[in-house]
Amino acid sequence: MRRPKTGSLLLGSSTLLAVIPTPPDHSSAAVIEEIPGLIKLHRNGHVVRLPAMPEVPSTYSPEPGVVSGDVTINPSAGLWARIYVPRYPGRHPLPVLLYFHGGGFCVGSPAWRCYHNFLSRLAGTAACVVVSASYRLAPEHRLPAAYEDGVAALAWLRQQAGRAGADPGGWGWRARCDFGRVFVAGTLPRTLLL
């Protein structure tokens, strides 16, 4: 007997009762594109993002000499950044690294543990303030949305340089920054940065 390729298995107590074939789903909810283990795009436009990488709060500290916190860049677009600042006292402001996570513009977050751990260590080792900016992801937000968000993050950072008083987040990160030495890096394709 041939087994059906798709189906539903009905169990009663501990005995197999029947296998009822289920026809393939050609409705608007059918998956039309998939990055296995990461994202599914359904015909009706619904996007399912699978929990590929654990997210950690900014208070999670893999590097004891670094403090981190989240700030809002653009609330209407949902843009935010995670900022890492070395704790050691210094008389001189630190250079700033604006970092964009990888993921092909489809997946990723500054809150992913892999990026959080790496950037926390980088801030401590390189003695710099790291600003890890979020950006809107495809397919919900097609390119050039991610590019525009990168430009918005850089513009936001420039605005921070000209502001006095308490900084977003209220924990003093802005006073530690040398806004005359800002660098951009990431695990994105280099074409984003050109």
Predicted segments, located by residue:
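N-terminal targeting or regulatory segments adjacent to alpha/beta-hydrolase or S9 domains
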Residues: 1-62
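Core residues of folded domains in eukaryotic genome-function proteins
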Residues: 35-37, 43, 67-69, 77-79, ...
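N-terminal cap/lid segment of alpha/beta-hydrolase-fold proteins
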Residues: 41-92
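Short, surface-exposed "cap/lid" segments of acyl-processing enzymes
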Residues: 85-122
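Catalytic nucleophile-loop/oxyanion-hole region of alpha/beta-hydrolase
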Residues: 109-118, 126, 131-179
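Short glycine-enriched nucleophile-adjacent loop
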Residues: 158, 191-194
